[in-house]
Amino acid sequence: MRLALALVILSLVACMVERATAGGVLDRVQSRGSVQCAGFERPGLAAPDRDTGAWRGLEVDICRAVAAAVLGDPDKISFHGYADAADKARQIHGADDVVFLTGTEIQASRLGGRIVPGPAIFIESHALMVPAAAREQHVAEIARNAGICFMSGSPLERSLPAFFDALRQRWRPVPFSEDGEMLDAYNVQRCHAVAGELTALAALRQQRGINNLESRILPEPLLTYPILATTSVQDGEWSAIVAWTVYTLIAADRPAGKWLTGGADAMSAPLAELGMRAGWQARVVKAVGTYRDVFERNLGAKSGLRLPAGLNAAPAAGGALASPVIE
């Protein structure tokens, strides 16, 4: 009986070891010598540098963090943007190691059964931008029947009516099919406000346009939604590595206190069974900084976008990005 039990236990252990060492994606990454990431272009999150063409942004830094975790070098990455049907095929066949997507993008590409919707790396929102001299300080103060510019065919066609219907307030839609035309119309005040993703509005605010118009983004979001670090359903071990890497960056912002562990140790995750070497979390934070560091240099005060952290701050600072912690 004991022998039979021992054989069962050894069999289970062998299965566990086999699973831990299988690591299809990790093996592929280590063989290739780089982590391959992708996402849709968004200012501050993922966009090619105007001078070098190299992709930069918060998503790129998350990719660098994963490379630091599994390869020991944050620069061993490749990043490309998604735009067309060929890119959809790449998603479906798992050609990329980490893909940054919203729920809408997952649904539109019919990827729900093919990817693991991993941790949120950024909470995006739909927002309104008005001239700096406008009287409105809040969205609810937008004048009745005010014209609002937005891109036709975008999710704003749903979020704008839903938001203003909830306020029981009339507004005038001014849709456009080209970004440049919309910006020009706003700059000459053919519409009183412009609606868009928060990151896109921050980039438009920088441009000012032909009339050098200064603008303000109103604080209330029309809609909020996360951008997720997604991975293939075929390799749960890789999904776990990516998730714990993101959580390490978020946990590293936690301040230490009398009863609290701070920094990356707020959620120690050795992950030896997944092939991660000791000290991997410290290497990640050393390579790219904490989540707050990554946010500030790409979207916050140290960037041209100058966005407040808002929901992308830690819960202690009024935000919504949280990681597992040791209570």
What kind of region is each of these model predictions?
Residues V60-V70, A132-E136, E141, N145-P155, ...:
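Extended ligand-binding regions for polar small-molecule ligands
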Residues S34-G44, T52-V70, E124-S177, E181:
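Bilobed "Venus flytrap"/periplasmic-binding protein-like clamshell domains
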Residues A38-G44, H80-A86, A95-A108, A132, ...:
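Beta->alpha turn/N-cap motifs
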